Amino acid sequence: ALAAPGNLSPMSRSSWSWRNGCNKPEIVMEGGNIAYHPVFQTTTHPDLSLITTCQDLAESLEQFHATSAATALATRLAAKIKTATPTLSMLSVRGMMVHSAKWTPEMIRIGNIKDIIPLCGYGVPDEETALFSNEKYATFIFENELIPYWEKDGSNTYNQLHFYDLPWPTEVLEQMGEENVKIRITLSYYVKPSPGYAGRSNKYRYPSATLHFDLKSASESMEEFLCRRNKSEGEKRTDNDTNRWTIKQQRREQGTVQSDWIECTAAELASCGQIIVYPGQGWWKERKLANVDNVIKYSLIVSI
């Protein structure tokens, strides 16, 4: 076999050569492996492929691999999440698939995050975590919609940001003291692409609007946190410690499903229980708002 167990399949597509493009794929699923043959060089093999039912009634089973297999497994997981929690929107289902994903040890050996993400995305979804997240972790799912822009003095400017004060046990976290904990945040939303514009020269001309999230740091006050992301509040700013994030802001925001996590002490996390979701650039901002929807639905998933 060409690829080691847990590593990226030789048949996988990636965005590694794009470098500054979107994070694709967002997740990876089993797609089989390729064997080496001295005559045919590389070839698929039943022992290195998945098995599925055959469309030929004379045969009961056939080998299954590559994108067809991975897509089928991803669809299966999405269906199981929706069945387990029917009230979830498909935005949340999509978000949970990414939120539950982890890198295998082989993927981590690739090296830097900037190389792992365009090759493997956020990793392999953990089905048990995706289906039973409330039983394994403290998990919050917020489904909402945001109006990103409004017209002021003849031009469009930013409108809403959403503030979430997480209902978590602050006293319990403080009592845990120096014990290490992990908080993961995933934001899932859809955009409307600009008609006839590929967006190669300006990534903000392709999506209708972009959304972003941020978490209050332990070293800043609530006022400083809100002012840092509210450009209408003047020049008062504080620097957000970007080193605390695993993926980092610039990398995670290359897509419409963004996930990142922080590992810190429980005492530090106790004072970081506030999240904001806010709008960024998009082609709606350059159009007459009366002619566009100007509403973005999103799902925000938080787990500790």
Roles of regions detected by a PLM:
Residues I183, D260-E286:
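Noncatalytic modules at the cell exterior or secretory-pathway interfaces
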Residues I116-H212:
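Secreted peptidase-domain scaffold signal
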Residues S217-I262:
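Low-complexity, serine/threonine/proline-enriched polar segments
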Residues G31-A35, W103, V191-P193:
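Short loop/turn segments at secondary-structure transitions that flank enzyme active sites
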Residues T85-R109:
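An often Trp-containing, charged/polar helix-loop segment at the C-terminal end
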Residues N180-E224, Q281-I304:
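Exposed low-complexity, polar/acidic, P/S/T/G-rich flexible segments that act as propeptides
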Residues A1-A72:
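Catalytic-core environment of secreted peptidases
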Residues A70-A84:
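Short, small-residue alpha-helix embedded
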